[in-house]
Amino acid sequence: MQIKVDIREHTLIKLLNALNNDYGFNFDISVERLDLGDISIWNEGEELLLLERKSLNDLASSITDGRYAEQSYRLNGHSLHNHNIVYLIEGNISTFSGKWSKIKPGTLYTTMFSIQYFKGFSMIRTFDITETAEYILRVCDKLSRSSEKFGFYHESFQPKKKNYAQVVHAEKKKNITPENIGGIILSQIPGISSK
């Protein structure tokens, strides 16, 4: 896995390198000027995820000065499916004062809703830049260990065919219907699978 980080992300670069070492990961972290986004995650020469990192103050400022609309427009034109473009929003809205901008917490909530619902981007909230760095590394760890390398919207994605009896837990009694009860009962017998 390769993590490409924009050269302007000085603190994040230091944290990623430190945590990469502390956790015993061996991800290739490179620093370069990214035309779009702040972090790009690659595997074997293919870009998997593009992440746009924003503190609440950054988000508020970008709404005020128009960068938010321009940036989301450019992200929408990226070759990755919007679901694989992730806004990482750092901070606690409950303690956001917005004293440096005219943006109120309610506007931040509706903007985050818009990012997901109307624009189709993914969004993750983190407490601070340290949690952001850990999140990025944990995502890379999961992707590197996963047998399914392709995300849902990737052209090579093949969904696994499972029937209900393969995924139901015995305690989910309210999910039992006359149509699936036979498979569920049989799958409870040792040595018998639902296949």
Give the ranges of each region predicted by the language model.
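Short N-terminal binding/cap micro-motifs at the start of the first secondary-structure element
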Residues: H10-L16
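Structural motif
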Residues: K4-E9
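Extended, alpha-helix-rich binding/interface surfaces that flank or overlap catalytic cores
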Residues: M1-Q2, L16-A18, D28-Q188
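Short, surface-exposed basic-aromatic patches at helix termini and helix-loop junctions that form
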Residues: N21
